[in-house]
Amino acid sequence: MKKELNHPLINFGKTGVLIINLGTPDSTGWLDIRKYLKEFLSDRRVIEVNPILWKIILNVFILNLRPSKTAKAYKEIWMKDKNMSPLKHYTENQAKKLSKLIGNEERIIDFALRYGNPS
């Protein structure tokens, strides 16, 4: 491969590997579910309708009615011993196992969630 004369020198250093998943609420509590739903459903890439109409629907109806139903569903799958959702648990474990397998000083492996914590 031919090197460009005006291309800056690239210093190679550490490499980061980030395993990202959609996200999950912090708990099965009504407020945590509401906070998560608000963050997720406020993303214009998730809901592509008229933003003014959507804000009314979201804030008047969904964020007042949906957290109770969603909390009930999360309680059925919630990992009580770890106090986290399976999605967060398995995403975090994948990052830890991958880090043990191929991680080193130059290769840092971690995880994040798009919505919720850690994001």
Predicted feature locations:
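Active-site-proximal alpha-helix that buttresses catalytic centers in soluble enzyme cores
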Residues: 2-119
